[in-house]
């Protein structure tokens, strides 16, 4: 995985609550196990009209949101069935950070495992970001090392994160990569047991 220490990008506002994994990536697109190629299906039923054209009313189809790399959403984001395809689609679409007041637990952990930083901010902070970014391009800097979210206009917030996940993202490790860091010690242990 690519390390994540600091990320600066434009926000895309999804002012909806209880966005479940079926809405993030609909079931008809779950027939593959590769981690790439799912971004084109992200929020498919909202992003596209029945004829396949972009839905002009959908938040992420607005010109200022199309280049967003930080998704700002409502509470309980990622609820519903457990599917790792949901963070795969979010990352493949181009989001590196998701900010919300709360996340479903399994989705929250799956984000870390796939190189996405889920940031929990207070409801009033998320509401302020939504107001700032709903109609215009609005840039944020998320500093994982300092655990801050800031902007040039003075917005500033802090967030909590488990030390394990923080270290994993900062170093760009997934669980397999972390295990491989101890490959020599594992071999020595195995040799001592023969």
UniProtKB/Swiss-Prot annotation:
Its EC number is 4.2.1.33. It catalyses: (2R,3S)-3-isopropylmalate = (2S)-2-isopropylmalate. The keyword Amino-acid biosynthesis applies. Transmembrane segments: none annotated. Pathway: Amino-acid biosynthesis; L-leucine biosynthesis; L-leucine from 3-methyl-2-oxobutanoate: step 2/4. One of its GO terms (molecular function) is 3-isopropylmalate dehydratase activity. Keywords: Amino-acid biosynthesis, Branched-chain amino acid biosynthesis, Leucine biosynthesis, Lyase. Gene3D superfamilies: Aconitase, domain 4. GO terms for cellular component: 3-isopropylmalate dehydratase complex. It holds the Pfam family Aconitase_C. It is an enzyme of class 4 (lyase). GO terms for biological process: L-leucine biosynthetic process. It comes from the Bacteria. HAMAP family: LeuD_type1. Catalyzes the isomerization between 2-isopropylmalate and 3-isopropylmalate, via the formation of 2-isopropylmaleate. Heterodimer of LeuC and LeuD. Belongs to the LeuD family. LeuD type 1 subfamily. This is 3-isopropylmalate dehydratase small subunit. It comes from Halalkalibacterium halodurans (strain ATCC BAA-125 / DSM 18197 / FERM 7344 / JCM 9153 / C-125) (Bacillus halodurans). The gene is leuD.
